[in-house]
Amino acid sequence: MYALGTHLLIELKNCNPEILKDLESVKNILVDAAKKANATIISVNFHEFNPFGISGVVVIAESHLTIHTWPEYGFAAVDVFTCGETIKPEIAAQYIIEAFECKVPSIVEMKRGIISHRNEKLPHKVCHEELQVVY
């Protein structure tokens, strides 16, 4: 089945807590992951909580990468959602796992936007004039 996007739900257990609590490190890891996956970065926004924990998003032309960290548990929840054929979400995921020194990662892959009942390949972006119902 063809889908509009691929969504990787990544659980990172037993990570290096020093990395998970460092705002610049977390931000750089997600930005670098987007670049390594061949994504086009649109904007970056991260927030550091008191006493610890970071949430952030890297908005890409092809969708987004998000993270929420719990350094006190050595845990992070990461989403890598991508659309189109030029971006490689699995490359981003592998880089993130390695960069956080994660010892127990797990990844669930979901295909998003399975809207064609004819199992036909769908274009990633279409012009407004080209929009049509595909089912």
From Swiss-Prot:
Its cofactor is pyruvate. The modification Pyruvic acid (Ser) is found at S63. It comes from the Bacteria. The active site is at S63, H68, C83. Is synthesized initially as an inactive proenzyme. Formation of the active enzyme involves a self-maturation process in which the active site pyruvoyl group is generated from an internal serine residue via an autocatalytic post-translational modification. Two non-identical subunits are generated from the proenzyme in this reaction, and the pyruvate is formed at the N-terminus of the alpha chain, which is derived from the carboxyl end of the proenzyme. One of its GO terms (molecular function) is adenosylmethionine decarboxylase activity. PANTHER family: S-ADENOSYLMETHIONINE DECARBOXYLASE PROENZYME. Belongs to the prokaryotic AdoMetDC family. Type 1 subfamily. This is S-adenosylmethionine decarboxylase proenzyme. It comes from Thermodesulfovibrio yellowstonii (strain ATCC 51303 / DSM 11347 / YP87). The lineage of its organism: Bacteria, Pseudomonadati, Nitrospirota, Thermodesulfovibrionia, Thermodesulfovibrionales. The gene is speH.
